[in-house]
């Protein structure tokens, strides 16, 4: 399940992120990759323990809290602090699957990466190439979104970033451990959630149909959630 979440950041927040990243220190992105992924990865990253990463990561986590669509799609139990990457001309990240388990910095605990998320910080007309290509059973999906928009997809997905041929592509990325680790079940709950939202727009909240659907949603979540 791929979900496009628009307008996660405001224009002012995007401008702040860009200003901080412009002034930040960029390092070889392979420093944070596993052995296999490091051979496929060619980009730059902001050090995850830097003041810039912490400040902007907290900004993004606050923005996620006000995004019902992200929370409906990911059903997050834990969210890893966001990281920040940059692809300049000639840079890319060949096909790979994200690692299954991630350490949460400073928390002394680990997170199962169920859901991957990329938040775009550069508008599409600022660069050429650089599409995030996600493979699933329906084929390949090339994603290139406006700054401030986000794509949410299963961390089990084979994916890549195409080579940049002009300009520079900046983004934040992070992983979530979901309360519902199975993507098929998450997709069913997401569809049901969106259906309930549509029903509630047309009917009152105390309409029997709205109550019945909401009850089904919560009872399925109760059955499948792992806390």
Curated annotation (Swiss-Prot):
Every Fe2OG dioxygenase domain range: 78-178
Cofactor(s) the protein needs: Fe(2+); L-ascorbate
MF terms (GO), sorted A to Z: 2-oxoglutarate-dependent dioxygenase activity; iron ion binding; L-ascorbic acid binding
Domain of life: Bacteria
Binding residues for 2-oxoglutarate: 169
Any one GO BP annotation for this protein: intracellular iron ion homeostasis
Cofactor note: Binds 1 Fe(2+) ion per subunit.
PROSITE patterns with a match to the protein in the record: FE2OG_OXY
Residues at which Fe cation binds: 96, 98, 159
EC number(s) recorded for this UniProt protein: 1.14.11.-
SMART domains, alphabetized: P4Hc (SM00702)
NCBIfam families in UniProt: PRK05467.1-3, PRK05467.1-4
Protein name, UniProt field: PKHD-type hydroxylase Mnod_1077
Species this chain originates from: Methylobacterium nodulans (strain LMG 21967 / CNCM I-2342 / ORS 2060)
């Amino acid at each position: 399940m791929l979900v496009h979440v628009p307008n996660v950041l405001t224009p002012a927040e995007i401008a702040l992120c860009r200003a901080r990243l412009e002034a930040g220190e960029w390092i070889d992105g392979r420093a944070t990759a596993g052995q296999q992924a490091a051979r496929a990865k060619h980009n730059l990253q902001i050090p995850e323990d830097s003041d810039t990463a912490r400040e902007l990561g907290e900004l993004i986590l606050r923005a996620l809290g006000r995004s019902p669509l992200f929370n409906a799609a990911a059903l997050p139990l834990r969210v890893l602090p966001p990281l920040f990457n940059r692809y300049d001309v000639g840079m890319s990240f060949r096909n790979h699957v994200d690692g299954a388990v991630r350490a949460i910095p400073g928390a002394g605990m680990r997170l199962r990466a169920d859901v991957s998320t990329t938040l775009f910080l550069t508008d599409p007309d600022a660069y050429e190439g650089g599409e995030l290509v996600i493979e699933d059973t329906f084929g390949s999906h090339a994603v290139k979104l406006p700054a401030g928009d986000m794509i949410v997809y299963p961390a089990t997905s084979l994916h890549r970033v195409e080579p940049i041929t002009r300009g520079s592509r900046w983004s934040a990325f992070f992983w979530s451990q979901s309360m519902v680790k199975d993507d098929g079940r998450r997709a069913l709950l997401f569809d049901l959630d969106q259906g309930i939202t549509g029903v509630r727009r047309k009917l009152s909240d105390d309409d029997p149909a709205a109550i019945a659907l909401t009850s089904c949603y919560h009872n399925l979540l109760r059955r499948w959630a792992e806390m």
